[in-house]
Amino acid sequence: MINYTTAAEAAKLIKSNDSVYIQGSVSIPEVLVKAMADRGHELRGVKVYSAFAIGREEAPYCKPEYKDSFLVYSLFVSNSVRNWIAQGYGQAIPAFLGEIPGLFRKGIIPIDVALLNCSRPNADGYCSFGTSADLAVSAAECAKVVIAPVSYTHLTLPT
């Protein structure tokens, strides 16, 4: 089922102690990441799983005032989370890229909420995760809740 809302409203679906997966590489859902970080003072113990979180200086949830709000589990330690992990507020998870979908599916890495980017749905309701679909498909399949801003730069799947 598709529901449209604002990023701030969608971020309210994230609860304390949830496990949140954030799509990486060139498809980081920046508007959702910011909306989640903006709720940092309301949240506690949110486990943030990310891979290839490149392209920014530091993730907005990696701030001292959020040290009790967000614990980072990085599947690839990139510049946006490196200092946060070095300060002890997160951990690196050593895994081959091809093994990670199995970790999601077996529940070893649980996903309550997946923050992804997607294309506009086609006539049949299908979306594309674009060029960063490496872990997005398995994350979407395993998450209890999927939140994705509709990206008009992602190609829409033909019907």
Where are the model-predicted features located?
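N-terminal active-site beta-alpha-beta segment that forms phosphate/nucleotide-binding
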Residues: 1-79
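A broadly conserved detector of short glycine/acidic/proline-rich loop/turn motifs that flank catalytic sites
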Residues: 26, 52, 76, 96, ...
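Short, acidic Gly/Pro/Ser/Thr-rich loop/turn segments
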Residues: 55-56, 121-123, 155
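Hydrophobic alpha-helical hairpins/lids featuring a short glycine-rich hinge
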Residues: 84-147, 151
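Conserved small/polar residues in nucleotide/adenosyl-binding loops
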Residues: 153-159
